[in-house]
Amino acid sequence: MSNFTAEDKAAITSLWGKVNVEDAGGETLGRLLVVYPWTQRFFDSFGSLSSPSAIMGNPKVKAHGVKVLTSLGEAIKNLDDLKGTFDQLSELHCDKLHVDPENFRLLGNVLVTVLAILHGKEFTPEVQASRQKMVAGVASALGSRYH
């Protein structure tokens, strides 16, 4: 089931085609760890996360950010089945990693902020509304195992 209109899908896919996953991924995960420092506990193996500059310059943060945004790219290809797309990741984050599902919402909001910064005037209110709908859908799909 999908709550995305044709206009939503067009806005989401159009902007995503312009996203540099390497730049946006590291920036998004880095900002999540800086703005919401309690999320750092899930990344103990990443080395130094002792300051904003250490986090933003950490190659493991950047690499994992790319992995996260690559998964989001898959979601964009499957907007009508976000739950199915993220079923295995939901299971991993719930059963093995024990990540609070609220963190998925926070990550989505940080991503929207990063995309707004990177895409400036192209990131219109309509694009933002569609993107917010998408990250909310992804957060719900990732949190589905918790329900």
UniProtKB/Swiss-Prot annotation:
Tissues expressing the protein: Red blood cells.
- What are the Phosphothreonine sites (modified residues) in this protein? 13
Q: Which organism is it from?
A: Plecturocebus moloch
Q: Which GO terms describe its molecular function?
A: haptoglobin binding; heme binding; hemoglobin alpha binding; metal ion binding; organic acid binding; oxygen binding; oxygen carrier activity; peroxidase activity
Q: Which GO terms describe its biological process?
A: hydrogen peroxide catabolic process
Q: Locate the S-nitrosocysteine modifications and list their residues.
A: 94
Q: Which domain of life is it from?
A: Eukaryota
The function of this protein is: Gamma chains make up the fetal hemoglobin F, in combination with alpha chains.
Which keywords accompany this UniProt record? Answer: Acetylation, Heme, Iron, Metal-binding, Oxygen transport, Phosphoprotein, S-nitrosylation, Transport
Q: Which residues carry this modification: Phosphoserine?
A: 45, 51, 53, 140
Q: One Pfam match, by short name?
A: Globin
The UniProt annotation places heme b binding at 64, 93
Q: Which residues form the Globin domain?
A: 3-147
Encoding gene (name): HBG1
Q: Which InterPro entries match?
A: Globin (IPR000971), Globin-like_sf (IPR009050), Globin/Proto (IPR012292), Hemoglobin_b (IPR002337), Hemoglobin_oxygen_transport (IPR050056)
Q: What family does the entry list?
A: Belongs to the globin family.
What's one GO-annotated cellular component?
blood microparticle
User: Can you state the subunit structure given in the record?
Assistant: Heterotetramer of two alpha chains and two gamma chains in fetal hemoglobin (Hb F).
What span is annotated as the signal peptide, if there is one?
none
Q: Which PANTHER family does this one have? A: HEMOGLOBIN FAMILY MEMBER, HEMOGLOBIN SUBUNIT GAMMA-1
Q: What is this protein called?
A: Hemoglobin subunit gamma-1
- PTM annotation (N6-acetyllysine): residues: 60, 83
